[in-house]
Design a protein with these regions (language model features):
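Conserved N-terminal segment of class I S-adenosyl-L-methionine
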Residues: 1-118, 215, 219-241
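S-adenosyl-L-methionine-dependent methyltransferase catalytic module, highlighting the catalytic core
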Residues: 3-8, 12-15, 139-148, 153-240
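Hydrophobic beta-strand segment of the Class I
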Residues: 78, 129-130
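Activation segment
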Residues: 104, 120-123, 138-139
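A short acidic, Gly/Pro-enriched loop at the edge of an enzyme's catalytic core
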Residues: 116-129
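PRPP/pyrophosphate-binding module of the type I phosphoribosyltransferase fold
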Residues: 130-132, 143
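Short catalytic micro-motifs in class I SAM-dependent methyltransferases
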Residues: 133-137
Length: 241
C-alpha cells in the first residue's frame, strides 16, 4: 500500500481493511458510458456489508447536517439500506421506512408499504426524504419527483441519488420494455434510464428543487466513498412552487 493510499474505516461497524468487490459489469453500457454509482467496483464492507452508496448518505447526515438535527426531524427513508436504517432509527424520534416491494426485501425493523409515486403523507410532512438510487427504477420519474417535493417541508432536504454518466446525454428509450432490453440499454434489468449529470439537475430544478452539488470524498475518503460520485442535495425553499 502506498503512503498516500486511503485506508478504509467503516463508519457503521468500525472495520478497517480492504473493501470487497460488489456489483456486476456483464453489460458493456456501464463501462462505455463510465456510469458513476453502478457496475463492478470495490465498495462493500466485508463485515457489515455496507456499500459506498449508503455510506455517502450517512456521511452527509452525520458530518455535514449533524446528528442532533435529526432527533426531532420527520424522516422518510425509501428502500432503506440496512446499516443506514439502523443508524437513523437510533438518531431520530420520527423515522419512517417505506418500500413498494416488501415481499422482495429483507429489512431491519418496521417498513411500511409506500409507493413513492403516490404516498399517503400530508403536504410538507417531512424534513428529510431519503430516496437513494430509486428514481432510476421508476418509469414516471417526474411523478415520483413531484410527489417527493409535495411531502417535503419547506426548508427540507431530499437525497435523490441516481447512477450518472458525464460523457453522454441521458439515455432513455421508449421502445425498451423487457428486462433483457433494459439490461442491454441501462446495465440493469430494473432501471428505466441512465441520467446525465446536467440533465438530472435540470430535471430536479424543473420540479422546483434548489440543487446543491457536493463531493465529500476529500475529507471523508476513508469511509469508502466513491471519489467520482457527487451528492445532489435537493432543497424545498420558500418562494418555490
Amino acid at each position: 500500500m502506498s503512503k498516500t493510499e486511503t485506508v478504509f474505516c467503516c463508519p457503521f461497524c468500525g472495520y478497517k481493511g480492504p473493501l470487497e468487490l460488489m456489483g456486476a459489469d456483464r453489460f458493456p453500457v456501464l463501462q462505455e458510458l463510465q456510469v458513476i454509482g453502478a457496475g463492478r467496483r470495490t465498495a462493500k464492507c466485508p463485515k457489515c456489508k455496507s456499500t459506498d452508496k449508503e455510506r455517502l448518505v450517512y456521511t452527509f447526515l452525520k458530518e455535514i447536517e449533524q446528528p442532533e438535527r435529526l432527533i426531532n426531524s420527520n424522516i422518510l427513508h425509501i428502500a432503506p439500506e440496512p446499516n443506514l436504517q439502523k443508524w437513523l432509527l437510533s438518531k431520530s424520534n420520527n423515522y419512517i421506512a417505506g418500500d413498494a416491494f416488501l415481499q422482495n426485501q429483507k429489512f431491519i425493523g418496521e417498513v411500511r408499504y409506500v409507493d413513492i409515486c403516490s404516498t399517503p403523507f400530508k403536504d410538507n410532512e417531512f424534513d428529510y426524504v431519503i430516496c437513494n438510487h430509486v428514481i432510476c427504477d421508476i418509469k414516471d420519474d417526474i411523478r415520483a419527483l413531484n410527489e417527493v417535493y409535495r411531502i417535503l417541508g419547506y426548508g427540507g432536504i431530499a437525497i435523490l441519488q441516481v447512477p450518472i454518466t458525464k460523457i453522454s446525454s441521458t439515455v432513455e428509450h421508449a421502445n425498451v420494455q423487457s428486462k433483457a432490453e433494459r439490461e442491454l440499454a441501462y446495465g440493469y434489468g430494473y432501471h428505466e434510464r441512465i441520467y446525465n449529470d446536467k440533465d438530472y439537475i435540470r430535471l430536479l430544478e424543473s420540479v422546483g428543487y434548489s440543487v446543491e452539488v457536493l463531493n465529500l470524498y476529500n475529507g471523508f475518503g476513508s469511509y469508502g466513498l466513491n471519489e467520482k460520485e457527487d451528492l445532489y442535495i435537493c432543497k424545498k425553499t420558500y418562494g418555490t412552487k
